Swiss-Prot record:
Changing A207T: Catalytic activity converted to a delta(9)-18:0-ACP desaturase. Catalyzes both delta(9) desaturation of 18:0-ACP and delta(6) desaturation of 16:0-ACP. Gain of a delta(9) desaturase activity with both 18:0-ACP and 16:0-ACP. Pfam families: FA_desaturase_2. GO terms for molecular function: metal ion binding; stearoyl-[ACP] desaturase activity. Delta(6) fatty acid desaturase introducing a cis double bond at carbon 6 of palmitoyl-[acyl-carrier protein](16:0-ACP), producing 16:1(6Z)-ACP. No activity with the coenzyme A ester of the fatty acid. The position of the double bond is determined by its distance from the carboxyl end of the fatty acid. Low activity with several saturated acyl-[acyl-carrier protein]s, including 14:0-ACP and 18:0-ACP. Requires reduced ferredoxin for detectable in vitro activity. This is Acyl-[acyl-carrier-protein] 6-desaturase. It is found in: Plastid, Chloroplast. One of its GO terms (cellular component) is chloroplast stroma. Fe cation 1 binds at E131, E169, H172, E255. Binds 2 Fe(2+) ions per subunit. Pathway: Lipid metabolism; fatty acid metabolism. Changing S231N: Catalytic activity converted to a delta(9)-18:0-ACP desaturase. Gain of a delta(9) desaturase activity with both 18:0-ACP and 16:0-ACP.
């Protein structure tokens, strides 16, 4: 029995397929109206005891594929991790609080950040808030069939990877959070509330607890965050803030290494199960690679994610173009266009995925126009100033 995915032919293609991961692509769809709802207060939410129906539960023989990969994961994926003693830590880049010159170091940092423009600060805060929601991302992997951490300290390689990946990622939000706090340029209490709201809201990437879908999603997102932090570093360098450029570049390098690991997993799945992996990729693209911080809000602006996304698009940090670039990279990286021996459904899935980049390119200008034309709004992160 194969891993069951709904027939590609049985679905209508979403109009222009604009409801995908790039914030701008997501918002160009049909109207510019908000599509993200402000979560109701906890006391007003209806809690159902019925679990959401999973559309694509993992078949036993598919689970066996992942169980059979333990040795491969240990030999091939775990080496992507860096030993803790060889890893950078936030204190390597920030003023030393034990030093007699701490106050002078902080003052110097504040001078360097004084000229960072508001739109850049909004983009940097949004990226940091996304990183700080790390508990949500670990939860996603630990609710995924077969690869989840059964005990919380499981020695199974899949679980070892997830814990160590989380530990490496934890430094990213930590360092930028401390940097922003020391800069004095932003309203930390509003930022902290945004982080708490986001973690409390969670996320549903549409992976249905299915490891095929989960690893495709993480491959995509790790590359997206590598691009975003690389762009933030480039802009910081242009503004003369070399320390921040170094911080962003260091984070981006981590994300590239993590992307390489997740992409390697999907590459192996294409080798072991080309049909099932092809159908999974097509399904994930139909579902859209939703941004992990899509439910971001600060308790005031229910459309904060849209507004933050527009700022990032305008600055060229992460745009509709990058979204399409990632898809093209993945198609080439996994040899999707060269797969042979697929069933009729598999070939339809292959044609669908390989045809998406051309369709996305046609709407990039519309996505940029959306970002340029959206009204500038006040951001609580920068004391209500408009961006």
């Amino acid at each position: 029995m194969a891993l069951v995915f709904k027939s590609i032919g049985a679905h209508k293609t979403p109009p222009c397929t604009l409801n995908l991961a790039s914030p701008a692509l997501y918002h160009t769809r049909v109207t510019m109206a908000s599509t993200i709802t402000h979560p109701p207060p906890l006391k007003d939410r209806k809690i159902s005891s019925t679990r959401r129906v999973r559309t694509y539960p993992l078949a036993p023989e598919k689970a066996e594929i992942f169980n059979s990969m333990h040795g491969w994961v240990e030999d091939t994926i775990l080496p992507f991790l860096k030993p803790v003693e060889e890893s950078w830590q936030p204190t390597d880049f920030l003023p030393d609080s034990t030093s007699d010159g701490f106050h002078e170091q902080v003052e110097e940092l504040r001078k360097r950040t004084a000229d960072l423009p508001d739109d850049y600060l909004v983009a940097l805060v949004g990226a940091m808030v996304t990183e700080e929601a790390l508990p949500t991302y670990q939860t996603m992997l630990n609710t995924t069939d077969v690869i989840y951490d059964e005990s919380g300290a499981s020695p199974v390689p899949w679980a070892v990877w997830t814990r160590a990946w989380t530990a490496e990622e934890n430094r990213h939000g930590d360092i930028v959070n401390k940097y922003l706090y020391l800069s004095g340029r932003v309203d930390m209490k509003q930022i902290e509330k945004t982080i708490q709201y986001l973690i409390g809201s969670g996320m549903d990437p549409g992976a249905d607890n299915n490891p095929y879908l989960a690893y495709i999603y993480t491959s995509y997102q790790e590359r997206a965050t590598a691009i975003s932090h690389g762009s933030l570093g480039r802009l910081a360098r242009q503004k003369g803030e070399m320390k921040l450029a170094q911080i962003c570049g260091t984070i981006s390098a981590d994300e590239k290494r993590h992307e390489a690991a997740y992409s390697k997993i999907v590459e192996k799945l294409f080798e072991l199960d080309p049909e099932g992996t092809m159908l999974a990729l097509a399904y994930m693209m139909k579902m859209k690679i939703v941004m992990p911080a899509r439910l971001m809000h600060d308790g005031k602006d229910p459309d904060m994610f849209q507004h933050f996304s527009a700022v990032s698009q305008r600055l060229g940090i992460y745009t509709a173009k990058e979204y399409t670039d990632i898809l093209e990279h993945m198609i080439a990286r996994w040899g999707v266009d060269k797969l042979t021996g697929l069933s009729g459904e598999g070939r339809r899935a292959q044609d669908y995925v390989c045809g998406l980049p051309m369709r996305f390119r046609k709407v990039e200008e519309r996505a940029q126009a959306w970002a340029e034309n959206i009204s500038h709004v006040p951001f609580s992160w920068i004391f209500g100033r408009r961006v």
